[in-house]
Amino acid sequence: TPSTEELGNLHRNVVFSGTDKLPAVPFSRLNSSNPEGLWRWMDGLRKQGIESLAIPHNSNGSNGAMFAFTDWAGNTIDQEYAEQRMRNEPLVEITQVKGTSDTHPLLSPNDEWANFEIYPKRVATALPSIAPGSYVRDAWQRGLATAANNNGNPYKFGVIGSSDTHTAAAPLEEDNYFGKVSIMDATPERRGSIPASFLYGTLIRLGMPDMVEEVDDKTYLNFPGYKFWGASGIAGVWAEENTREAIYDALRRKETFATSGTRIKVRFFAGYELDEADLTSQDLISTAYQSGVTMGGTLRVDADRRPTFLTWAVADPNTAQLQRVQIIKGWLQDGEHREQVYDVACSDGLSVDTNTHRCPDNGAKVNLDDCSRTANVGASELRTLWQDPDFVPGQEAFYYVRVLENPVCRWSTWDAIRSGEQPRPDLPATIQERAWSSPIWYSASTDDNNFVH
């Protein structure tokens, strides 16, 4: 679990494919703070028949270091670096309790849903973390840029979600949030969602004045980052069977998705023969596998043919219904990063506006007096076929799915209501739970930096 000299987070989790043969001791920051040292260690184990992969997490707190354009020594990333990183790190964590690392409003100003559970600090500090180089969508775009310069793509990874609670207990439900680690944030008062008592607030102010803040003439505890934490997240894996071997292989091939805590399921395929696919067929998924590539894969250019994308999202029956399915595209134009969010499926029989690429409002609301939600609004599942209206043949790009639920009360609002308080005005009262797929890359390149064990 290394960090930079500026306290930028560079934590990784290492997953082994099996348990029959394991290293005697793990690699840690006592060995090196350089992630490249970890990869060399993993490569060495692989030569001994010990297969593993590493998953970076909390990139949002890396202060731009997780997805830099340079290596540890400050040299420009090259093909060898890209191949080594992708060989060892095919996945990245996109959401967890310490914030979501999809994107940031500063990076995606035209994405209305970018400001979701943003954790603005470097991990375990009060220092700000810069956005460029810290968020996953930006990393995918950076990967296109390095590949365009013939230096390979070190950021062609899939996504998972995780909890990072260190307790084997994940606080995934907004209405049942119990914090990250109980000794720190087990009560609404400690995590800053309700005003501190006079006694507790006074004691903290006397001993740690920076750990108290005033909001609308009310005193709240301000322990580092607690108010920004989220009830997240979950890793989704499409494996042939529920075995360690099958799940590991799915992780390795990046057939994975993430959710912010609810149990949404999402499928994503792309191909040149999917435009006639029958969305009602019981053989839809087998047809998609035969006719295209799935999340985490690369669709090769086929002359000027326009690919068709298949998305299928299923709601968690115990939470809010689905509001919309989106496909997010990233590409380079004259060397500049470009992105576009397309709504591709709307709930309640609504249709996407072809000019704005947005679904109309489906009318889903939340009553902040008791957190009740508008009834009979939303969809239990959404599936569709879609083609990119701005498709340019041969233009390198990535596409990934984001699924949005109807709004619900955030955990901090539930805390306030149950304590007889008003929700904090400086925190979001509601959120939209969501899921993200791993991308599909559209590419003319024959070198995709994929390593399949």
Where in this protein do the model-derived segments appear?
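Structured catalytic-domain cores with a bias toward divalent-metal coordination
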Residues: 2-3, 27, 31-63
